[in-house]
Amino acid sequence: MALSQKALLVLVLSMLLTASDSWARRINCKVFVYAPICRGVAAKRGGDSLSVGGSAELDDTLTDPFLKSEEPKEWRELTRLSRVLQTFLSHPTGEMEQHD
């Protein structure tokens, strides 16, 4: 191989490597939203609705009712009524103990 052919080969290979590297970075993140290079782009462009704080608040809103230790008011009332009914049924004479 002549020197000019080697130089031409090196030039072409370096251009191909440069082009392939820049081509790999040019991904349309609107189409490939889950591509590793596109992670976080929607949050950066989206504004407040997609911010991390907004997301955490939304998660809290969705999970709080399930994580609260306090029973809903209806369940407390049903539990109280079932206790009164059990007490009534356990005393056939009709005498009932006072419940709150």
Curated annotation (Swiss-Prot):
Tissue specificity of this protein: Expressed by the venom duct.
The keyword Signal belongs to this UniProt entry's keyword annotation: yes
Disulfide cysteine pairs (residue numbers): 29-38
Residues that make up the propeptide removed upon maturation: 44-100
The organism of origin for this protein: Conus ammiralis
Domain notes: The cysteine framework is C-C.
Role summary: May mimic the function of prey elevenin neuropeptide. In vivo, intracranial injection in mice induces hyperactivity.
Annotated localization: Secreted
Signal peptide: 1-24
Name this protein carries in UniProt: Elevenin
Anything else known: Negative results: has no effect on six different human nAChR subtypes including alpha-1-beta-1-epsilon-delta-epsilon/CHRNA1-CHRNB1-CHRND-CHRNE, alpha-3-beta-2/CHRNA3-CHRNB2, alpha-3-beta-4/CHRNA3-CHRNB4, alpha-4-beta-2/CHRNA4-CHRNB2, alpha-7/CHRNA7 and alpha-9-alpha-10/CHRNA9-CHRNA10, when tested at 1 uM.
